[in-house]
Amino acid sequence: MRVLLSNDDGFHANGIKALKEIVIKSGIASEIWVVAPLNNCSGSGRSVGLNVKVQVSKVSDTEFIVDSTPSTSVFLALRKIMNYKPDLILSGINHGVNIGNDVWYSGTVAAAAEGAAINIPSIAISQEYDNKSGEINWVNPQRFLKQIIEMLMNVSFWNKSTVMNVNFPLMPAKGIKFTDQGKYVPCNEIEKNESSDDSNVSYTITRITPNKKNRAQCDGSIKAIDEGYITITPLKFDMTDFDVLTSLNSLK
């Protein structure tokens, strides 16, 4: 099986290195490609480099660094960089979960979505970490990811235009839960940077996902992660609110 790895934390991030090591040890891939952004693109969503020159640097015959977004990286990988399309795309392992509203911002999910857009099985993978220490433990992916990939690849009813969004909890995993996305109210952790010019100020958004204390009433993947479960959520492209659409059509 030919597997393409990408991410949104950048080519040199520890998460994608851990992912490659897991895939190698699992023995599920006969060929592994890595095509990932040059820089950290967290929060980039599905933005692409349109009408701009995008530099692609070859590291090896199967490893490339793209000076652009996660979506651009995979878009080019599938159309220009790889000699054959992959059988599977794995995006991650992201430094931090992508749960609830996170999926709208996530470059990790977006990279996987580029594969799903042309019906290639695509899985986004994220790992919760300790916000205080910043340390990330890869034990849960190392223990469970091979099993999850094999399970999903054997699901006959998986519509390949659907992204499978997998999140690993910080604590030792209690098991796996298939969950809906869930939702939260974004937090307001914004720092105003020092400036002597009041007419030209800058801000740093330091956090969007609320901490566990402030998301206690949340449901779906958010609740399951906080309870210590690995979550798997199928995500589709069509975001139409069909209930509202039906009501709008009744206005005719």
Curated annotation (Swiss-Prot):
UniProt cofactor(s): a divalent metal cation
InterPro entries: SurE, SurE-like_Pase/nucleotidase, SurE-like_sf
GO cellular component, one term: cytoplasm
Pfam families for this protein: SurE (PF01975)
Annotated positions binding a divalent metal cation: 8-9, 42, 94
Reactions listed under catalytic activity: a ribonucleoside 5'-phosphate + H2O = a ribonucleoside + phosphate
Keywords, sorted A to Z: Cytoplasm, Hydrolase, Metal-binding, Nucleotide-binding
Listed GO MF terms: 3'-nucleotidase activity; 5'-nucleotidase activity; exopolyphosphatase activity; metal ion binding; nucleotide binding
Keyword NAD: no
EC number: 3.1.3.5
Taxonomic superkingdom: Bacteria
Cofactor note: Binds 1 divalent metal cation per subunit.
Keyword presence, Cytoplasm: yes
Subcellular location: Cytoplasm
PANTHER family tied to this protein: 5'-NUCLEOTIDASE SURE, 5'_3'-NUCLEOTIDASE SURE
Family per record: Belongs to the SurE nucleotidase family.
Free-text function comment from the UniProt entry: Nucleotidase that shows phosphatase activity on nucleoside 5'-monophosphates.
Protein name: 5'-nucleotidase SurE
Organism of this sequence: Ehrlichia ruminantium (strain Welgevonden)
Lineage: Bacteria, Pseudomonadati, Pseudomonadota, Alphaproteobacteria, Rickettsiales
